[in-house]
From Swiss-Prot:
Membrane topology: Multi-pass membrane protein
Designated name of the protein: UPF0060 membrane protein Psyr_3752
Stored PANTHER family: UPF0060 MEMBRANE PROTEIN YNFA
Organism, scientific name: Pseudomonas syringae pv. syringae (strain B728a)
Protein family membership: Belongs to the UPF0060 family.
Domain of life per record: Bacteria
Annotated localization: Cell inner membrane
Main location: membrane
Keyword field contains Cell membrane: yes
One Pfam family it belongs to: UPF0060
InterPro entries hit by this protein: UPF0060 (IPR003844)
Keywords: Cell inner membrane, Cell membrane, Membrane, Transmembrane, Transmembrane helix
Listed transmembrane segments: 5-25, 28-48, 59-79, 84-104
């Protein structure tokens, strides 16, 4: 269960870090936005290493579903844009895929 906490915290820090770059490069905000962006993206990377998983690739794949959930939430809550039906449909497919990866059986490679 602690993995989900790390995933959600990592998603928030990653989205904020990327959004800070977006504000600077796409919306003409101050270049000082780079500072919190870099700090946030560093914290994101550190948080993702807290996930208990045998392989980084599997952890990142499972995290992808959480990231997409957080991104759609960010779209609505921070950017005040109502998600489209296609956003919700895509989110559902991604969450199903991430759940399969996260909860799927683990066999040895022997």
């Amino acid at each position: 269960m602690l993995n989900y906490l790390w995933f959600f915290l990592a998603a928030l820090f990653e989205i904020f870090g990327c959004y800070a770059f977006w504000l600077w490069l796409r919306q003409g905000k101050s270049a000082l936005w780079v500072i919190p962006a870099l700090v946030s993206l560093t914290v994101f990377a550190l948080l993702l290493t807290r996930v208990e998983a045998a392989y980084a690739g599997r952890a990142y794949a499972a995290y992808g579903g959480i990231y997409i959930v957080a991104s759609i939430a960010w779209l609505g809550l921070v950017e005040r844009v109502r998600p489209l039906g296609t956003d919700w449909l895509g989110l559902a497919f991604c969450v199903i895929g991430a759940t399969i990866i996260l909860l799927g059986p683990r066999w040895s490679a022997a």
